[in-house]
Amino acid sequence: MLFHIYHLSRFTTANKISGNYAAFCASLTKAETRSDKDAPFSTQALTRSKSKRKRSALPVANGLKKPTRSIKRPSRGERLSATTI
């Protein structure tokens, strides 16, 4: 609690003067949750460990990332219209 009060007093004046109240609120949230590394319940810790394993897997290829060839079409001014032929 003492850290929270110190943190609040340290950023309140500077951020209210600059008008950046959203950054002030975000800095409080970051400071409060920075040390929270353990999940409160064992089921949450298990879920968290499973999700970390999923993200570490190799990505699945769902098609080409870059096309190997493309069709370059003439601009509208360069091609003849079908009705003017």
Swiss-Prot record:
Organism per entry: Pasteurella multocida (strain Pm70)
Protein name per the record: Uncharacterized protein PM1295
Domain of life: Bacteria
Source organism phylogeny: Bacteria, Pseudomonadati, Pseudomonadota, Gammaproteobacteria, Pasteurellales
Chain positions covered by the region annotation Disordered: 35-85
